[in-house]
Amino acid sequence: KDFALPMILCNLSLEIEQLIDKQLIDQTIETCLHEVMEVFYQKDLGLIVENVSAEDNSLVDSFEGRSVNPGHSLEAMWFIMDLGKRLGRPELIDKAVKIALSTIEYGWDKQYGGIFYFMDRLGRPQQQLEWDQKLWWVHIESAITMIKGYQLTGNKECLAWFQKLHDYMWTHFKDPKYPEWFGYLNRRGEVLLPLKG
């Protein structure tokens, strides 16, 4: 079972709630909140995994079953914060901030800076060859999460991480000649492809 669907439905449900039956939206929100925050979030790891067993929601010891995508997890947490605000559930916002801080600490490259694209929850080799690349969208979504976490809770760790992300992004992704960003960096933060994001 894949994290992508319940994760994106957390956001999509708020975007289209004016167009769809309220009962369906409310049911979808509750189902997706449960999936994201109770099934894919692994409390003992402090992380969200990308895949669990479709049979019993357990962890699977395979490439897919060990995969952690820090950017995906961090993006989901600002969706959860929006839902927490919409539903009047501050405890949901607090939990999202806690997960976000745990995830960014885990996903931050301690040697070169930036957030890894993919990681293995057991520290084993990755199937994805691009696992150590630094992608623009991962950093943008993470920055949104951190500034939103600070705005909603006043948590100073979120503000510090936002500043760290801001500095990294404007130092590494920005094209020095034109007001655009490169989309893909290597692990060291050097432009990997001249494509713009």
PLM feature spans:
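Glycan-recognition and catalytic cores of secretory/periplasmic carbohydrate-active enzymes
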Residues: 1-197
